């Protein structure tokens, strides 16, 4: 087995004996004017081999971290630097399976879970019981498999989809896991993306999900995570991308007749454009600082509705460059250390900006276009 699979799946991200003292981010020199592709490759390859101890608290999210690394390498044109067979075997080991077909009616979700920490030996053979399938982990698992070119017809999609509908609530929202949890637009999006990637909508009631999404739209045109909540960049992305994946809104709403649209694209456009701050970056909510990840969350919404030409791209690029680390990767704010989450969405943002040498983006799925079926 390759070192990569061992490091991703190890019990510890780094030796616990290592000194874990706090340290302050280094003072950054003047930001580079160039997208440092080679440094980003080195950063992701380092993370692919060994996760630093700072990620110990995210042990439950190993699949998500792997998605950021492997999909990030694809954006950088380096998909072939991973052992696809080893990665596929590792990802597939996280799928839960029902004991029998009757088990599909027990209310559990048989998707993918995010970590070995939610598996437990249950018999003399050492087989593992999967008891923590999660919608977000399932999205990440399928995303990785698509990115490495794995045939999704080889997974037990029938059990996954039949059991996924157990998570949908009466109001159309989704729980992330069968033992309960928050219900909001994040998990509606995960469900829609899962159905889209598996090319089957048997796992959700689309009409009910659509109505829930529309109930989350605020007076200002944006969407909150739940009905009646403040408009938020991430929630707005989940709403618009879900509606697009489900086929309820088309391409380039602003250029087409919007009178028959189920949303008001002009009001949404205005809200999104107001999120670009004076420093060129995008904020997630009113009166919040600019943050690297919202260059994707808001930028992708504008791309989906046909309003991306109105982004001040030079200013956005300058902000993103200020968040580019000299070590590779991107930080949340200028001058901080990079992390995998903001690095990945930094790469997707630069793909939206059509940075030379990056793979094009499928904004609906947040994946490289070549990994997106039917787009």
Swiss-Prot record:
Its required cofactor(s), as named, are: Zn(2+); Mg(2+)
Disulfide cross-links: none
Activity as a function of temperature: Optimum temperature is 30-37 degrees Celsius for CTIL substrate.
**Expression tissues:** Expressed in roots, leaves, stems, flowers and siliques.
Detail which positions bind Zn(2+).
291, 293, 342
Location of the region described as Disordered in the Swiss-Prot/TrEMBL record: 1-33
Biological processes per GO annotation: negative regulation of abscisic acid-activated signaling pathway; protein geranylgeranylation; response to abscisic acid; response to auxin; response to water deprivation
Q: Which UniProt keywords apply?
A: Acetylation, Magnesium, Metal-binding, Prenyltransferase, Repeat, Transferase, Zinc
Cellular component, GO, one term: CAAX-protein geranylgeranyltransferase complex
Q: Record's Pfam families?
A: Prenyltrans (PF00432)
Q: What happens when the gene is disrupted?
A: No visible phenotype under normal growth conditions, but mutant plants have an enhanced response to abscisic acid (ABA)-mediated stomatal closure and increased lateral root formation in response to exogenous auxin.
Q: Which residues carry this modification: N-acetylserine?
A: 2
Top class in the EC scheme: transferase
Intervals holding PFTB repeats: 157-199, 206-247, 265-306, 313-354
Which reaction equations make up its catalytic activity? geranylgeranyl diphosphate + L-cysteinyl-[protein] = S-geranylgeranyl-L-cysteinyl-[protein] + diphosphate
Query: What's this protein's family per the entry?
Result: Belongs to the protein prenyltransferase subunit beta family.
Q: What's this chain's function? A: Catalyzes the transfer of a geranyl-geranyl moiety from geranyl-geranyl pyrophosphate to a cysteine at the fourth position from the C-terminus of proteins having the C-terminal sequence Cys-aliphatic-aliphatic-X (CaaX). Seems to exclusively prenylate CaaX substrates with leucine in the terminal position. The beta subunit is responsible for peptide-binding. May negatively regulate abscisic acid (ABA) signaling in guard cells and auxin-induced lateral root initiation. Negatively regulates ABA signaling in guard cells. in negative regulation of auxin-induced lateral root initiation.
Protein name as catalogued:
Geranylgeranyl transferase type-1 subunit beta
Native source species: Arabidopsis thaliana (Mouse-ear cress)
Which gene is transcribed and translated to give this protein? GGB
